[in-house]
Amino acid sequence: NLRAIPNQDGTNSGVFVVLSLDRGLVIIGGTHYAGEIKKAIFTIMNHILPAKGLLPMHCSANTDGANSALFFGLSGTGKTTLSADPERALVGDDEHGWSDEGVFNFEGGCYAKLINLSKKDEPAIFATTMMRGTILENVVLNADGTPDFTNDSLTQNTRGSYPIESIENRTSNSMAGNPKNVVFLTCDCLLYTSDAADETGR
């Protein structure tokens, strides 16, 4: 378990992500959150793609074929849940690009937050947790080997990583037209809304 030594390495903790754009190098240590890998690559893409006329976005996306929608928000605000709408085709759940032709998914997979996941409220995501190819990250298992999605003893940030093909209702090429709806999710888990969310200043 490689960890930084804060006093020696100039970090705030034992966890570190070191990124060199010149070398195309990322070194990650001291964390059990695999999301740091994808976020490091996304950071590099944010540096490279705008110069090529592409906008990298931390959002989920879906479409009904005619109308595409983007959902922006911090972790845990509902991007993955909202994009897995049974009435709309999933483009992707977390990282996308926007070009003149439309939006497209970078990843080819999903990275869903699983804490308090229920079959009733999120059936498509719940189904992926039982599929071949899914990786459950930091999810505590019951004595019989089944996952306990309510257990946050390791972390609230439990995750499921699964191929986008695990979602039945998806676009065939992880692409969609230019979005007509852009949604900014501003509530936290207690449904408190940020002051910055009110454009009127009230």
Segments predicted by a language model, with ranges:
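N-terminal pre-Walker A segment at the start of P-loop NTPase domains
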Residues: 38-56
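Conserved nucleotide-sensing/catalytic segment adjacent to the nucleotide-binding pocket
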Residues: 99-150
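Glycine-rich phosphate-binding P-loop
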Residues: 66-89
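Phosphate-binding P-loop
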Residues: 53-55, 59-66
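Single conserved hydrophobic/aromatic residue that forms the stacking wall/gate
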Residues: 192-201
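Long, basic/Gly/Ser/Thr-rich N-terminal segments
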Residues: 1-26
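Glycine-rich phosphate-binding loop used to anchor ATP phosphates in small-molecule kinases
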Residues: 139-187
